[in-house]
A protein has these predicted regions:
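Membrane-proximal alpha-helical signals and transmembrane carboxylates
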Residues: 2-210
Length: 210
């Protein structure tokens, strides 16, 4: 309920309050040593108010915790500004999390109950989501925005169909569609989408070659 209240307040904020917020462009969620690992990816420059003012770049390492809720609370407590997720582009799940079906289901339940992230963001899987950040220095924009454009371009080129968070959360309950998520890999600091992950019924996950 607290998260929902914060999100509702953010929607009503005036432009003068932008300086009190930071804007994650992506989020990564994985499983590490039996716990949830969570973190945000931030832009280098403000992209929300048509100015070139530098964001307060928050270089906070991902945090771990027993639940997604505890991770979000811990991460937010370390930020100097309030995280406004309304402009987020991409959510990346780690392969370890996807193989831990219990925790994966718990994460989806938390996201559905809280509405923490926009329903229209793209969802993909990576063996090591943190490795994606190692490519950011060579990118023309922040990693989240880059991934959004890259995924859209690859979909247009026939690499596969993209899946948005809202649809994923709905299918968790409907169990109608065979869920296919882009699988991202890195090689020589370059990101590739070569494979798809299929989640038939949320009970197991495996990688399928194109």
């Amino acid at each position: 309920a607290l998260v929902l209240s914060v999100q509702q307040l953010l929607c009503g904020c005036s432009a003068t309050e932008l300086e009190d917020r930071c804007f994650p462009m992506m989020a990564v969620v994985d499983e590490k040593d039996g716990q949830i690992s969570f973190g945000y990816g931030f832009p280098k420059l403000s992209q929300k108010d048509n100015t070139d003012l530098e964001e307060a770049r928050v270089n906070i390492a991902p945090v771990t915790g027993k639940t997604m809720e505890s991770c979000v609370q811990t991460y937010d407590s370390r930020l100097e500004k309030l995280a406004d997720c309304n402009h987020m582009k991409v959510l990346v799940f780690g392969e370890n999390l996807m193989e831990d079906t219990g925790r994966y289901a718990d994460v989806l339940s938390y996201l559905k109950q809280t509405g923490l992230f926009p329903r229209n963001i793209y969802v993909c899987v990576a063996e090591d989501p943190l490795a994606l950040f190692e490519t950011e220095e060579d990118l023309p924009q922040d990693l989240g925005s880059y991934l959004e454009q890259y995924l859209q371009n690859q979909e247009s080129a026939g690499s596969g169909k993209l899946f948005k968070l809202g649809r994923l959360l709905d299918e968790k309950e409907n169990h109608i569609l065979q869920i296919m998520l882009p699988y991202l890999e890195t090689e020589d600091h370059i990101i590739f989408w070569k494979n798809m992950y299929r989640v038939p019924d949320d009970r197991f996950l495996y990688k399928q070659e194109k």
